[in-house]
UniProtKB/Swiss-Prot annotation:
EC number per UniProt: 6.3.3.7
GO MF term list: ATP binding; iron-sulfur cluster binding; ligase activity; metal ion binding; oxidoreductase activity
Gene behind the chain: cfbD
Names of required cofactors: [4Fe-4S] cluster
Family per record: Belongs to the NifD/NifK/NifE/NifN family.
Protein name (record): Ni-sirohydrochlorin a,c-diamide reductive cyclase complex, component CfbD
A Gene Ontology biological process term: methanogenesis
Organism: Methanocaldococcus jannaschii (strain ATCC 43067 / DSM 2661 / JAL-1 / JCM 10045 / NBRC 100440) (Methanococcus jannaschii)
Enzyme class: ligase
Length: 352
């Protein structure tokens, strides 16, 4: 059992709907539910509405609340986006699911494409929310069976990585806001003086790659680097492919391990490539704990860069140095180009 806070299945469903290309999301619940996720998705171009369930609606039913929110959202989107049939996700919350609201009630509304996702924060692992979103998309014919099975497999692998090697591997992981930044920079400065060779590995989750590619781009300025990246432009939903294309304009990859949504499995491919390289250091940016880095020669310097204060200890257990980029996801939403990272900017200054 995990006792520290974990991401919500509701939020995961919302981000997955974003990847599917929805114009808007209606949260069928109280106005404050998933507030941070809703606000961040607005930065990414998704309009977020709420059915504003209150105590009366919890007692007497909230169908009328949802109808009013849907009517307003459709009218708003048609006016603002000039779309005849906007795509709208309707996402459940703890409140609406506990009182048994029917999210599929309005799915046949011909004014919009409606994708209902019956989910709440007690549904289980956060990836359950994303899987439920894909189940609805499959049922409505928005994706095919092959893509659904692919997404389901990857989402389950993502959970497996976190439970075995990441933030869900222990009952409680203390957040750490200090990292090994100074030590890592000293090691890299020494390596530069020796004309050392570095393997740069981008193994990032979806759009976070806009930030996690940055320190690797900086390293390429000062070192002889071999670049490995999960930037396959032929894998994933359209948004995922576009993000990979955008990053490849700025970051040249010598080896491609898979798509941006395949980070739970591309780490193994990256390690197979690394085993055949003659390098002095390996820098992995994004989700470094998805790489079985323990299989690499112990004499090679290993630096892992990831997001969030609870990732430090899991990464430090398998890497020589762990770097934490705070709020990486929030910084990249709405962006379509490289976003500067804390480590990358300090590294650039230190290596000049």
């Amino acid at each position: 059992m995990i006792f520290h806070p974990r991401p919500s299945p509701i939020a995961a469903a919302m981000y997955q709907l974003r990847d599917l290309g929805v114009d808007a999301i209606i949260l069928h619940g109280p106005s404050g539910c998933c507030f941070r996720t809703a606000r961040l998705l607005e930065l990414d171009g998704v309009r977020v509405f709420t059915s504003n369930i209150d105590e009366n609606a919890i007692v007497f039913g909230a169908s009328e609340n949802l109808k009013k929110a849907l009517d307003y959202a459709i009218e708003y989107l048609k006016k603002e986006l000039k779309k005849e049939r906007p795509m709208i996700g309707i996402v459940g919350t703890c409140a609406s699911m506990i009182i048994g609201e029917d999210l599929w009630e309005f799915v046949d509304d011909d004014r919009a494409i409606i994708i209902p996702v019956e989910v709440h924060s007690g549904s289980g692992d956060n990836t359950i929310g994303a899987i439920k979103a894909m189940e609805s998309a499959l049922k409505l014919g928005i994706i095919d069976e092959k893509e659904f099975e692919r997404q389901k497999f990857l989402l389950k692998k993502a959970t497996e990585v976190e439970k075995k090697r990441g933030m869900a591997k222990k009952e409680y992981i203390k957040p750490t806001y200090d990292d090994d930044l100074n030590e890592a920079i000293k090691v890299l400065k020494d390596l530069k003086e020796k004309d050392g060779k570095i393997a740069c590995v981008l193994n990032a989750k979806k759009e976070t790659a806009y930030l996690f590619a940055h320190p690797l781009i900086v390293l390429n300025k000062y070192f002889n680097c071999v670049n490995i990246a999960n930037l396959d432009i032929n894998k994933g939903l359209p948004k995922i492919r576009r993000d990979a294309q955008n990053i490849l304009r700025r970051f040249k990859a010598d080896y491609i391990t898979g798509g941006l949504d395949e980070y739970p499995i591309t780490g193994e491919r990256a390690v197979e490539i690394l085993k055949d390289l003659d390098v002095d250091a390996i820098v992995v940016s994004g989700v470094p704990h998805a790489l079985p880095i323990e299989e690499i020669d112990k004499d090679i310097i290993k630096i892992g860069i990831s997001d969030g204060p609870r990732t430090y200890h899991p990464i430090k257990e398998i890497y020589d140095y762990a770097i934490v980029e705070l709020d990486a996801h929030a910084k990249v939403l709405g962006k379509r180009d490289i976003v500067k990272s804390r480590f990358g900017e300090i590294l650039d200054y230190a290596l000049e």
